[in-house]
């Protein structure tokens, strides 16, 4: 069922905090299964993108979630709480549409997954005990554990379970010239930090079982640092104030302020081609304006996520759009219409602003 793609990707994305990781792992597998079932690649790709970004938005481990909260100067979990008000309706509409699509369009293909299942069983020791690691991470997320602590615990538990339950994988990846303890340590460090690939008889599984580790995230980290420096420089020279003044002259009421913020995020995603730059610059640009209107900062952080984070995957030349289309092997043009959650989110935040639903005020300024 097509909606199952959304649910699976949502769970993985919440647990990992990364839409990119979700696409590069289960996303690839789901697209492969979809092709075997002769389901349009764009439909499966759209479901993967929708689920991945739903989880990315609500995960306290997500880089964009932390960035939007930090730029808007909002407590992380308060930011996530306010995100649910617009995010849950958006994903609900998406699921309903995919259920309807599933009823009206049945798959004509037939796939035999026994080869993939047997390959996985022959490669790994599969046990329900292995679910302990993601369950503990999810519990820590629910308990509002700081992201770094949750990531550290998840990493250490994953390493321990790898030693206990997957010794054959460690032996395969290790240098046999070293002692078992040293070899295991080296494999675990390499897995956490750099590229590791587990070879099987299936090309789909080979892609699924490949990882870039922490080094694979360095480009993203450098990009975030660069955007923060750029945003700070723009603020220091007064450029943000000049641009925001021109925009704010048009935003003479609360709805227009929200609309201007959404427009700014979309424009930066289109021109700067990066969601981090869109979040940082728009956040700094409208922070004072929201305060002057007597609006709590969580309104701004939510709007940044609803318009900057999710729409980045809908633009072919944006870093997110280019990445997802490349990894999934599905062009943005193919999955755009099916990534319903992503393009409905900006409209949802505008509807809430127009109807003044869940718009928290500071209570100290004129409304």
Regions found by a protein language model. Name each.
Residues 5-13, 89-102, 129-143, 152-166, ...:
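Hydrophobic core segments of alpha-helical transmembrane domains in multi-pass membrane transport
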Residues 4, 85-93, 219-227, 256, ...:
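Hydrophobic alpha-helical transmembrane segments of multipass membrane transporters and ion channels
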Residues 31-134, 138, 293-367:
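Membrane-core helix-loop-helix motifs of multi-pass transport proteins
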